[in-house]
Regions:
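Accessory DNA-binding and partner-docking regions appended to nucleic-acid-acting proteins
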Residues: 1-109
Length: 109
């Protein structure tokens, strides 16, 4: 009916989530650091967005990290039982950044 049609036109597009904003910039081939600068956020925040996007299965871990790094992370996480990432960070030191550990953990579902 006319009434419901006109009502539909008034509904605004849902506001994009901060994750979607990050994803759009990523699709424009901006690096994580460029996205952070563009959005006036920290790289840490952008990495957190990607962890969320990986959990939501919108982005693949392999879109962000190189295969050799994923392979190393896979080995590091082999006996991981969901405990604190701090233990892995302690064992592996600077081999992995906190962000890499978080991204990999997000990919575990």
């Amino acid at each position: 009916s006319y009434y419901t049609d006109s009502k539909k036109k008034k509904t605004k597009e849902p506001k994009k989530s901060t994750y979607e904003d990050t994803l759009e910039l990523w699709k424009q081939n901006l690096s994580i650091y460029e996205i952070a600068k563009h959005r006036k956020l920290t790289p840490q925040t952008i990495y957190n967005h990607f962890a969320k996007l990986i959990q939501m299965e919108i982005v693949q871990l392999s879109d962000i990290l190189p295969e050799d790094k994923i392979s190393d992370l896979r080995a590091a996480f082999k006996d991981f039982k969901g405990e604190s990432l701090g233990e892995l960070k302690e064992i592996h030191g600077d081999k992995f950044s906190w962000d890499e550990l978080r991204l990999y953990k997000a990919s575990l579902g």
